[in-house]
Amino acid sequence: MAPAIVMSNYEEEEIVRPVADFSPSLWGDHFHSFSVDNQVAEKYAQEIETLKEQTSTMLSAACGTTLTEKLNLIDIIERLGIAYHFEKQIEDMLDHIYRADPYFEAHEYNDLNTSSVQFRLLRQHGYNVSPNIFSRFQDANGKFKESLRSDIRGLLNLYEASHVRTHKEDILEEALVFSVGHLESAAPHLKSPLSKQVTHALEQSLHKSIPRVEIRYFISIYEEEEFKNDLLLRFAKLDYNLLQMLHKHELSEVSRWWKDLDFVTTLPYARDRAVECYFWTMGVYAEPQYSQARVMLAKTIAMISIVDDTFDAYGIVKELEVYTDAIQRWDISQIDRLPEYMKISYKALLDLYDDYEKELSKDGRSDVVHYAKERMKEIVGNYFIEGKWFIEGYMPSVSEYLSNALATSTYYLLTTTSYLGMKSATKEHFEWLATNPKILEANATLCRVVDDIATYEVEKGRGQIATGIECYMRDYGVSTEVAMEKFQEMADIAWKDVNEEILRPTPVSSEILTRILNLARIIDVTYKHNQDGYTHPEKVLKPHIIALVVDSIDI
């Protein structure tokens, strides 16, 4: 980021602005127009209904099969992305499995693969099952038996199961180390598709992956399986393509809205990432019933990105102080106090939330927009504090930094906004979220520390000293490497908190909690290998976006 001297009409003086050199959008006008082929969509929908009935019958029949067969069927249906059609049936099956043998005494649990799949599925569905099920695979010294190293499928699912661990579950920590070591050794010698699955899993665990991304990958892998279920595979392909049509339609709406705002021309200092913003929303919820929610959340992410860059990459303290105050007052009459460039984003922000209120009033839910506004005011107030630190060269203590930075992670705002378009989200859910429950704080912490690790070098190059890493280094007199290790440790702890908070009993439904879990998953994918995939989407996000909203699956 190179400083630039510009003349401001707001105040007759030369102002040095740290103008950012963000790369342009990768997508141009690619997504601005899309029309659904209704004939194809109708054809897909009709066949899906038939396949849906057949799959439901298959699930019912599975109740009379072995435990291993039940679990494998549920796992395949979930990984193919069609489980949302059968939520009640799957929940009933898992509940029966859990209640029928709560101590896992069935002989089938002596199989590592069966035990691992069962443990992960039950944990992911909120059952607080004990990891002691894996003690039967350890020797007298409490070490995993070396004889297991030939069971690659079992090791792969043990690895996946280890990622749902919570605090003080040492056996799962050991399971992770044990499985990774043997899978890495075995990977070069395996045949496809198992070799591909192992390599992919070691790069991105299932539990921490974005569901829609993982579904697209698994469909291609499952097609290579020798003993695949052709009915389920065809169902998954049709459903993926039909849902993709809806996603393309929504992205077209968001892209046109973004183009009409013309921020690329009027606010050239800011990131042009509308497509990446929509990608995030597919990570939060991909199912068709969340269409309105996705569009609302995508627009909010795009808007907060503009506000963030205004504070971080362009504004000066005097301007930012007035901008912050105007947003706290949330009144269009405040616009005349602002410099010209700030008037643009201020009006767009207020207009957006007015649109939300009008849209939600149709369902009698306009009152919940208040909670999203309050989160917007909160994050802007915290942005101002960070902006002052940067401009004035102030370095806070790490505790002072984190107390402010959890809000600027954006996850308080985005989680609240993610509920706006969900008809099932009640005022009580927003009230619960406003208390900053443990799972929300964990998510914000995860987002903050992972972002800080990924952006440290860039921010250091801009002269930013009030970063989390720098604050920790100064407070504790340690090296950059040690500080980053500490922040990674904080991320690991946050993940355990998230995993723990989705286990029953829970204060809200799994539908509500899953949005928070999915936001955590987005961080794991977007900042893979300490890269800021949002600011620099070329390597990290571009392939996923192409897979999700450009390329359909060959039927």
UniProtKB/Swiss-Prot annotation:
EC number(s) from the headed UniProt entry: 4.2.3.21
Motif mapping: DDXXD motif: 308-312
Cellular localisation: Cytoplasm
Main localization category: cytoplasm
This protein's UniProt keywords: Cytoplasm, Lyase, Magnesium, Metal-binding
GO molecular function: magnesium ion binding; vetispiradiene synthase activity
UniProt comment concerning the protein's domains: The Asp-Asp-Xaa-Xaa-Asp/Glu (DDXXD/E) motif is important for the catalytic activity, presumably through binding to Mg(2+).
Pathway assigned to this chain's UniProt record: Secondary metabolite biosynthesis; terpenoid biosynthesis
Catalytic reaction list: (2E,6E)-farnesyl diphosphate = (-)-vetispiradiene + diphosphate
Induction / repression: By elicitor from R.solani.
Chain ranges passing through the membrane: none
Protein name, as recorded: Vetispiradiene synthase 1
